[in-house]
């Protein structure tokens, strides 16, 4: 079985001191350095692999302090506070001994509770009825996704005019991969 490129990109190795090492992945390269979404996923993966983990991820806030360079990095994840069912995390990503990214995360044990969907899925065509976005994809990470735009998207021309911020699209991995949390 082939390992998905996303799983390769977030792969970490635990060190004796409790930190993790990893590497950026060429499939998720952006204009300068790696795509920020994979940087965020790498930070969260350090939490998910930590031996003190409680529960599943609820939230993640990422601060890109400096440009992440292509290559090796170190991640330090530590629980800042653990309660009965929630856990708060602080995460640092370092390259060459310098902090390039910080993050905070909250994990929790899921319990039976009430739920309410405050917003419903918009009425849109089925994915098969929307043509896939094609053309030049200058950044490698864009090539990892099957994007089917419905409304909005990147303006074809940067002319200074204002456009609606509404964007609707179908998005999935080019190489199929199940969602981690749905």
Go through the PLM ranges and name each one.
Residues 1-182:
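Terminal targeting signals and extreme-terminal segments of soluble enzymes
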């Amino acid at each position: 079985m082939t390992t998905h490129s996303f799983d390769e990109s977030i792969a970490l190795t635990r060190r004796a001191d409790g930190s993790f090492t990893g590497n950026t992945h060429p499939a998720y390269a952006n204009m300068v350095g790696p795509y920020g979404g994979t940087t965020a996923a790498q930070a969260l993966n350090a939490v998910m692999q930590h031996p003190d983990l409680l529960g599943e991820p609820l939230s993640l806030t990422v601060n890109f302090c400096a440009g992440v360079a292509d290559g090796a990095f170190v991640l330090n994840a530590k629980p800042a506070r653990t309660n009965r069912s929630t856990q708060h995390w602080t995460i640092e990503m370092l390259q060459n001994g310098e902090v390039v990214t910080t993050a905070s995360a909250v994990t929790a044990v899921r319990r039976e509770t009430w739920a309410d969907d405050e917003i419903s899925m918009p009425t849109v065509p089925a994915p098969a009825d929307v043509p896939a976005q094609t053309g030049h994809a200058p950044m490698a990470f864009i090539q990892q996704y099957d994007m089917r735009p419905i409304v909005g998207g990147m303006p074809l021309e940067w002319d200074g005019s204002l456009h609606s911020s509404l964007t609707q699209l179908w998005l999935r991995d080019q190489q199929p991969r199940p969602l981690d949390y749905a």
